[in-house]
Amino acid sequence: MANNMREIKSRIKSINQMRQITKAMKLISASKLKKARAQLEETLPYYNKVKETIADILAHSAEVESRFFDIREEKEGKKKAYIVMAGDKGLAGGYNSNIFKLTEHEIGDNKENALLLVAGTTGRSYFSRKEYHVHTEFDYAVQNPTVFRAREITEIILDLYNKQEVDEVYIVYTQMISAISLEPRILKLLPIEISALREDVKADEIVLDQRLKYEPSVTEVLNVLIPKYIKGIMYGTFVEAFTSEQNARMTAMDNATKNADEMLQKLNLYYNRARQATITQEISEIVGGASALE
């Protein structure tokens, strides 16, 4: 009985220590999530204005030619680049595994024509182990999303696209629909679909003058604006992925803390019962010994 009590007491101590860790991780994730959301809200107006300007040009220009709108002719074996935004750490429920599943499903049997740019050490390890072509790795990019890092990745993919080393570029990330709903998504980045961009910016949001002239030409202006637009999407999805990961980890740690509380409640009950049984046994032995002396 005494050995059993010592074992229960040891388990209570271990679970208490684990509970302190999970509770601390939950609080850290909540703080990071709040900071990232504020960071995104500060930068969104600028990138929204860039998007509106591009939509205005498309709305008021007869024909627009740009390599970024170049829908390259259909062919077998199209080279596709995937920017995969995974986490640098685990303990976030199904956050990372859902991203991996979506990426593999999207690539399908076209593995030899898929080129990956992976943000996050978990993604790098997973896809390298599966023998995918990992072109570039970005450690701690999602953990610390910055405009500088978004520009760095944008320059790499634009270089690949302009050299026609890839025909299409996609971003795979997790969108936070709500505090309790996360959805892995895939977004086509290049080439830009003009119809989708026009639909994305409603007509009443375009406030620029129709008679506005762009110098030296519409094409040249677009070639300057579109990389900024892509960088904005890149940064926005980085922050979205970061907030989703923190939310997933916060939820996972909250559930772990609750499970620890339930286990502690049961173990304390077992410990008290064992202690009560020990005391009862000791009393019985004392009473039995006293009776034997009479």
From Swiss-Prot:
A GO biological process held by the record: proton motive force-driven plasma membrane ATP synthesis
Organism domain of life: Bacteria
Short name of one Pfam family: ATP-synt
Keywords noted in UniProt: ATP synthesis, Cell membrane, CF(1), Hydrogen ion transport, Ion transport, Membrane, Transport
UniProt keyword Metal-binding, yes or no: no
Subcellular location: Cell membrane
Protein's membrane topology: Peripheral membrane protein
A GO molecular function held by the record: ATP binding
Annotated GO CC locations: plasma membrane; proton-transporting ATP synthase complex
InterPro entries tied to this protein: ATP_synth_F1_ATPase_gsu (IPR035968), ATP_synth_F1_gsu (IPR000131), ATP_synth_F1_gsu_CS (IPR023632)
Family annotation (SUPFAM superfamilies): ATP synthase (F1-ATPase), gamma subunit
Homology family: Belongs to the ATPase gamma chain family.
Purpose of the protein: Produces ATP from ADP in the presence of a proton gradient across the membrane. The gamma chain is believed to be important in regulating ATPase activity and the flow of protons through the CF(0) complex.
Quaternary structure (record): F-type ATPases have 2 components, CF(1) - the catalytic core - and CF(0) - the membrane proton channel. CF(1) has five subunits: alpha(3), beta(3), gamma(1), delta(1), epsilon(1). CF(0) has three main subunits: a, b and c.
Family annotation (HAMAP family): ATP_synth_gamma_bact (MF_00815)
PANTHER family: ATP SYNTHASE GAMMA CHAIN, ATP SYNTHASE SUBUNIT GAMMA, MITOCHONDRIAL
Protein name as annotated: ATP synthase gamma chain
